[in-house]
Amino acid sequence: SFFQSLEMGELLTKRGYDVRFVGYRDSSSTIVISSLVFCKKMFGGLYMELNSGPVVSDNSYLEKFFQSLRDYAKHEGVLELVVKPSQTYQTFDSNGQPLGFEDTHLIEMLTKNDFQYDGLQTGYPNGEPVWHYVKDLEGITEDTLVSSFSKKGKVLSKKANSFGLNITRLTKDELPRFKAITEATSNRRDYTDKPLDYYQDLFDTFSDGADFLIASLNLTTYLDLLHSQEDKLKKIAENLVQDLSINPKSRKKGNELREIESQIESFEQRKQNAEQWINKYGTSDIDIAASLFIYTKQELVYLFSGSLEEFSSFYAPII
């Protein structure tokens, strides 16, 4: 996990945490388990946390590692040691159906060694997810990515890419644009957003290993696009009307015409919305969605994101 990286250690240090790297050696002094842990002061002692770890090359030493970590924490005056393991508890498909049984081995081992299990959580506790959606990217290229989506994902991707949205990689000075989106989202969904200086520190620490992306919309360009697309539909409708005048009993042509007329009607509504937004926001570009990606050798992490509910019909997060 990126959370066990040197960059994350540097970021946590910038944020005022006491960062430590701990490990366990086998009988030949080979490091078989290692982890980043971080501490902060609490009343009467220290709080210590191991998040998304440890990094393991030999699982047979896991119990000894956690026993040693527990003893080390006691020696350092830690009052609360929190472990958030990276091991998978259970795997589900995209519909939420389990693909296997719960793996309770780690929980049983930790509780046997005086740790208390807090149970499975939902939502966004402390601003971080405990449920992860994982997609295997092996063999997938930029050209084949969309074809790997679900049927719904393909439809939404096609729609999102038809609106003329612009994707921009932000500089550090532009991060307030990112913060404005994530803050609006956190207020709407009732969780605590990170402060702006956290995102700035992350930008500095991860450098090219992080992308802060913004999806923006130019309403004037969007309105022109709607006019152009509607004109094409009207020409198709005119041809269908002409075909039906020759063969009025053609069920196929009749169905096609009804579908095209329905699309034209939806374009009229979209144009009205666009004109209302122009009156409200003017003709400058509007930021409607934001996302932060972290890159490591093992994974690409879609870490933080947000979008404006008013523009949800553009499906900007998908692109």
Regions flagged by a language model, labelled:
Residues S1-G44, Q90, F115-N126, V134-S313:
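A conserved beta-strand-loop-helix scaffold within acyl/acetyltransferase catalytic domains
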Residues G45-E128, S262, T283, I288, ...:
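Acyl-donor binding region in acyl/amide transferases
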